[in-house]
Amino acid sequence: MKDYIKALVNYGLEHELIQQADSRYVYNRILDVMRLDRGGGTAPKGEPLTAILTALTDDAVRRGLIGDSITERDLFDTRLMGELTPFPHEVHDRFVREYAVSPERGTDWFYNFCGDVNYIRRDRLARDIRWVYKSEYGPMNITINLSKPEKDPRAIAAARRARQNGYPKCQLCAENEGYAGRLDHPARQNLRMVPVLLDGKFWYMQFSPYSYYDQHCIFLNQKHTPMYIGRETFDKLLSLVTMLPHYFVGSNADLPIVGGSILSHEHFQGGLDVFPMTKARIEGMTFFDGFPDVKVGIVKWPMPVLRLNCASADRIVDLAERITCVWRDYNDEAAGIISETDGVPHNTVTPIARRDGVRYELDLVLRNNRTTEEYPLGVFHPHPELHHIKKENIGLIEVMGLAVLPPRLKTELETLKNAILSGSDIRADASIAAHADWADELMRKHEFTPENADEILRQEVGAVFVRVLEDAAVFKRTPDGRAALQRFITSVNRIVSF
C-alpha cells in the first residue's frame, strides 16, 4: 500500500517547509485532515507534488469527505498544503534574511517558496498558451489563460445556496492569509505575505496565484479601502521601486471599465517582467513648465503614454500630480473627451513605475471611461466587433502589452480552424458563430492550409489585440489625435503654479 501522506511529509522536508523534528506532528495533522486514525505502507518515490495531492484528494472523494468538483478539490488540497506551510512570521523572517543579501534574492526566494507550497500552482501555469505578435509598436505578448480554473456549475449552484458571511471582505484583504475558504471563496491556508511599510502604513506583498507574468506580485493595503489615483499613489509606487529596484510596480485605474476587476481594495501589481510597453521607443519629447529636470517622452504605443524620467522621485511625483489633476477636469469635445457626466468622473490615469539605472521612471497612460448609447461598455473600450476575442476591461496588464485572453478561445480557435479548413458553415455552429465575420475577412486575406492555419489564427488574434488597445486610446494615433494630445499638454503648461 502506498502511503501518500508520508510522501507529502517527505515533500515538505525536501523543500525545507518543515524540519525533521516536525515530521511526526505534520503526519498526524494530515491524518486528521484525511479523517484517518492510522497510516501505513511505504511512501512512493519520485512522485511530483501534483500526483501526491491528486491521490490524496481522490481518496477523499471516494470516501465521501468532499464532492468531486474542482472547487471542492482545490479547497481540500489547499488545506493539505496548509499543514506544510510555515507560520507567517517564519516566512517574513526568512524573506528579511534573503533580502539583506539583495532585493533580487529576497523576491526570488519568496516566489519559489509560493510555488513550493502550491499557492502558485505550477502545473496549471504550464497549461497557459503563449505566443508573440510582432506589431508596429514592437512585440506584443499574447496568452490564453488556462491556469485560473473555471467554476464548476455544481459549485456555482452550491455557492449560491450557501450563506454569505462577508469575511474576508474581498479576495485581496489581509484576512485571507490562512483562511480555509468556502465554495464562493478560495482557500488560502498556504498564502503567505510580507509586510511593507508605505507612507507610515502597513501594506503587504504577496504573489498572484495565477502568475500572468514572471514574479507577478500584488501589493495590498492592509485596510479595505477603494482604489485611488493621486499624489499618494505615485509616491507609493516610486517608494516600492526604491525597495525593489529590479521590479516594476503599477496601479490599475480607479474608475470602472478602465480599472481592474477589483476596485474596492487599494492594491498595486508588480514583478520582473519587462513588458512590451517598457521596450517601446520614444517617438517624441515634450516639456512642462517648471520641470526642466524631468525628461518627458511620448511613447510610440497604441494608447497615449507620457513617460516621466528624473533622478528625483519627488520631482516625478510633483509633475505626475500636476498632469493628473489637469486631466481629471480636462474636456475636449472635438476629441470626444468629456471629464464628467452629472458629477460622475470619467478621466483618470494608469501609472507604472520602474527604475532606469539610478533614475526613476513613471509612465502615465491617459484613460477615460465614458459610455454612450452606441458604446454602452465604453467609448474607449474594445468595440463590439472585437468582443469575440476580448470583451473584458483593459487593465494595467493589457495596457502594458500583455493580452490575457479568456480560456474559451482555446477550444473556439481549434473549432474555427477545422471549420475553415473543411469549408463548414461557421455561422451554423453556435460555438464559433461570433467569429464568422472575422473568419470571412481572414479567408479573403490568407490561403489556409493544415500547416499554416494555427499560426495565421494566432497572428490575427495578436492583430485584434492591438486594435483593442487602439480602441482604448483616448487620443488616437492620427494627425487629429496627435494634435489633441498636444492641446492637453499645452493645457497642463498653462498651470503656472500648483
Describe each region flagged by the PLM.
Residues 190-192, 222-249:
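Helical scaffold of the NTase/Pol beta-like nucleotidyltransferase catalytic core
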Residues 1-219, 223-227, 302, 317, ...:
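Active-site microenvironments that recognize anionic phosphate/pyrophosphate groups
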